[in-house]
């Protein structure tokens, strides 16, 4: 009987150790009712810690050997290369505008769009943020939105960076496809490279010498912002069109020193009265999309 008891205890301990080792396997997902517990996490579901190509371990001279002096040198260099503070990137979509005329020069904000921008500027002012940088798309509707916001947040217009890379466009063919919006393949080819370049320019972890958390305000466009959100969170970028954000809404992303990215707001417009909540061009405008 004692032998049988020992055998059962030993088998139980071995089984427990087996399941514990499986739980610790980094390739296993946290299981929900719809997942297959025997299937490893798909590669696209794993976080790429070097998404911005600024992993500190890859920014320093690698170890030549395992001597203590060399290891001390490597660790000292690594510590110097590590970011210390977070970067906050706040994205604001332009206000409602009229798609009138054949060029961007005639696409001005509506009266409601101007009021939306004012509400957003007031909201940003209430947050009490000290802005390190303000960047705006060069398109008229984004410029007009930025001008209104600048007055509310008391930011010098001369310091604003105007960026052509942030102009509206077709970032990547959406999945699932939609029938009402079908740009030519050449437009995706042209716009996609530009918008991706904008993402790489503005989205990265802090530099090692940054000694305080930084706040960057970007005033841009719906397609660009939605693509940025998918890219920053490492969601499939083809899903950008499944997201809807209102005019003059606020999206807030934070890049931590480790390179991890989190989202605080997505298309926040709850600070506006309900009659100012819009996300499409007015019906009486030309080329409604």
From Swiss-Prot:
What role is this protein assigned? Displays phosphatase activity for serine/threonine residues, and dephosphorylates and activates Pk92B kinase. Has apparently no phosphoglycerate mutase activity.
Cellular localisation? Mitochondrion outer membrane
Superkingdom is: Eukaryota
The organism of origin for this protein: Drosophila ananassae (Fruit fly)
Give the stretches traversing the membrane: 7-23
UniProt keyword terms in alphabetical order: Hydrolase, Membrane, Mitochondrion, Mitochondrion outer membrane, Transmembrane, Transmembrane helix
Give the family from UniProt.
Answer: Belongs to the phosphoglycerate mutase family. BPG-dependent PGAM subfamily.
Answer yes or no on keyword Transmembrane.
Answer: yes
Q: What is its EC number?
A: 3.1.3.16
Q: Which GO terms describe its biological process?
A: positive regulation of mitochondrial fission; positive regulation of mitochondrial fusion; protein dephosphorylation; response to anesthetic; response to heat
The identity of this protein, by name, is Serine/threonine-protein phosphatase Pgam5, mitochondrial
One GO MF term attached to the UniProt entry: kinase binding
């Amino acid at each position: 009987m004692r032998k049988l008891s020992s055998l059962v205890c030993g088998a139980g301990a071995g089984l427990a150790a087996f399941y514990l080792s499986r739980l610790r396997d980094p390739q296993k997902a946290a299981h929900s009712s719809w997942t297959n517990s025997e299937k490893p996490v798909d590669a696209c579901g794993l976080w790429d810690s070097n998404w911005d190509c600024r992993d500190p371990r890859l920014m320093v001279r690698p170890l030549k050997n395992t001597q203590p002096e060399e290891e001390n040198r490597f660790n000292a260099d690594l510590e110097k290369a590590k970011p210390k503070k977070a970067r906050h990137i706040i994205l604001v979509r332009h206000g409602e505008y009229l798609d009138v005329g054949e060029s961007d020069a005639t696409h001005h904000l509506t009266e409601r769009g101007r009021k939306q921008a004012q509400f957003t500027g007031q909201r940003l002012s209430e947050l009490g943020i000290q802005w390190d940088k303000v960047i705006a798309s060069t398109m008229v509707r984004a410029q007009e939105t930025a001008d209104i916001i600048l007055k509310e947040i008391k930011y010098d217009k001369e310091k604003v960076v105007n960026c052509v890379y942030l102009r509206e466009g077709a970032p990547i063919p959406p999945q699932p496809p939609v029938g009402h919006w079908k740009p030519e393949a050449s437009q995706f080819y042209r716009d996609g490279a530009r918008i991706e370049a904008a993402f790489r320019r503005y989205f990265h972890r802090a530099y090692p010498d940054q000694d305080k958390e930084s706040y960057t305000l970007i005033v841009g466009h719906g397609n660009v912002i939605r693509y940025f959100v998918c890219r920053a969170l490492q969601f499939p970028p083809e899903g950008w069109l499944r997201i809807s954000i209102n005019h003059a809404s606020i999206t807030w992303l934070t890049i931590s020193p480790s390179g991890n990215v989190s989202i605080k707001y997505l298309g926040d417009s709850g600070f506006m009265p309900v009659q100012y909540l819009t996300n499409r061009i007015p019906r009486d405008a030309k080329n409604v999309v």
